[in-house]
Amino acid sequence: MKRIHFDIETDGFYGAYWRCKDESDEAIILMIGDDPEDHMAKSGVKWLIERGVNVLTMSPAKKDYGHHNYPLERIEAAITWLKNQNINKIGIVGASTTGTLALTAASFFNEITLTIAMTPSDFIWQGFMQGKKDGCKEWPIEGESLFSYRGEALPYMPFAYKHPDYWLSLIHI
């Protein structure tokens, strides 16, 4: 499948655009998988293209598994690019953390007219990184949200993460 690739530095967002064979004014911003061109993303693209929907796959950054202060301006830049391609109907799809991103973006940008959020949170979490720290795979970043807009972190629910007394916060619930 042919695609156009986008980078944060040059285009304002990280992703790939997959155009239908036939003319369509519909597109989905698809945020599943770890990369906009991995197997999961391509599977979603194939399914949507077969149904006449153009697809813009996106992820935070190349192999970036942390989620902290993700600028909603990236979604905004993607929407602007789609509108410049004569796309009039824009949907957004995400799963887990990107499901929360899909809901948040749809609440900010009225150009999004369809939102599918698979297993999102009910609220925006504190931003986090992934790797190895304190015996954990993920850990929160102090003072950072999952998302930001216009340089400001969005309000968030903090994690109860204070090793070694993390367990104490659980018994006081």
Regions found by a protein language model. Give the residues of each.
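Structural recognition of the beta-strand scaffold that forms the well-ordered cores
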Residues: I29, L56-M58, V93, A117
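Primarily recognizes the serine-hydrolase "nucleophile elbow" in alpha/beta-hydrolase
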Residues: E37, T80-L154, Y161-W167
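N-terminal cap/lid segment of alpha/beta-hydrolase-fold proteins
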Residues: M1-E23
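Short beta-strand element of the alpha/beta-hydrolase
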Residues: D25-G33
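Short substrate-entry loop that stabilizes the transition state in hydrolases
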Residues: I32-Y65
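Amphipathic, non-transmembrane alpha-helical secondary structure
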Residues: K42, K46, E73-E76, T80, ...
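Conserved small/polar residues in nucleotide/adenosyl-binding loops
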Residues: I171-I173
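Catalytic nucleophile-loop/oxyanion-hole region of alpha/beta-hydrolase
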Residues: S59-G91
